């Protein structure tokens, strides 16, 4: 069982375990040793980050650890997470590292890894890394210590890759687009790419100060962007999160469309064009029941996975699927990217607007979501509330009541000490009762 790694790398509050400079140094050394263990020649790693203040500290600590084991480090600076996957492959690196806590507040940070193929590491590799981190590793000989070098054009390389995923003749001339970059990693790249495609760009969340990432902006807080869309009479809004691997879309009325709606649009469009590999979409257990029904009506399959875009990608690779994602806005288009890419997904939504000549509001609501209720229960370290008898009894009773009229999902968060209790049903009484009963049982088990 992994102790250090969660569903998306190592994450926590900066300067608190495990996100300390000392731990980042140990992680860098362990990862460096792991990825050059076959021989003693010098290898290469790329490191990207978002705009958090603590990113400087972790960038330097990781660089020290990696170079101490003989890895040459290529520093990309602030770039979207998908750019790290791209650059790992294009720079022929042995490893890619992204320093980010994604949509979390500025005081948090995280470290996630990409293998030489540009894909996130498997659970098995992370277990091996944890053992090395705990045990410590021997440094390289003095003559084999690595070097560090800055790569100044990473965001431009990323921009060209994103644009290459679109039809060659697609232009956004005359389209007024609000782009909310969450004061994060895409604050320069996203507006530039939209401008290059011909859009009239209205930027929001493009003034990072190290402390304002995801604060009152971005995909998890799209209200300000929605107000901007309406106030400026914009055609559409695109909201990214801090590391730009998530997206939500805002139509011209200020209504927000989540990842499920975007996946529904792309899946139906790709299926109609014969581009949907495997005839199915890959999504997590959190995706709405309404999405499943929408796809079924169109003869499109739905493959569900655990929560986390890495598990979506794993299933896509196993089954030969090329479209997947999460309700939260991670959209993975594996013909073009190795991980969720919020900007790329947003641009493909714009491409559908242009191709069909339709408003955002005509495309952003593909299906009527089944009412969904989600509640979180915090627990303390060492507690295992889901194993308690009263919790298991409450779950069984709730599932019995929902049978055929909805669904219930209970899971432990992979990034926080939370138990997430979610249910879906058109019956509001049944919906609330199912969630409340399970939540009460979990809370009792944590006392």
Swiss-Prot record:
Cofactor binding description: Binds 1 Mg(2+) ion per subunit.
InterPro entries reported in the protein's UniProt record: A-D-PHexomutase_a/b/a-I, A-D-PHexomutase_a/b/a-I/II/III, A-D-PHexomutase_a/b/a-II, A-D-PHexomutase_a/b/a-III, A-D-PHexomutase_C, A-D-PHexomutase_C_sf, A-D-PHexomutase_CS, Alpha-D-phosphohexomutase_SF
Task: Provide the Gene Ontology terms for cellular component.
Answer: cytosol
Q: Which cofactor does it need?
A: Mg(2+)
Q: Which GO terms describe its biological process?
A: carbohydrate metabolic process; peptidoglycan biosynthetic process; UDP-N-acetylglucosamine biosynthetic process
Q: Name one GO molecular function term.
A: phosphoglucosamine mutase activity
Task: Provide the record's note on post-translational modification.
Answer: Activated by phosphorylation.
Keywords noted in UniProt: Isomerase, Magnesium, Metal-binding, Phosphoprotein
Q: Which residues carry this modification: Phosphoserine?
A: 102
Residues where Mg(2+) binds: 102, 241, 243, 245
Q: What is its EC number?
A: 5.4.2.10
Query: What is stated as this protein's family in its record?
Result: Belongs to the phosphohexose mutase family.
Function, as annotated, reads:
Catalyzes the conversion of glucosamine-6-phosphate to glucosamine-1-phosphate.
Q: What is the protein's given name?
A: Phosphoglucosamine mutase
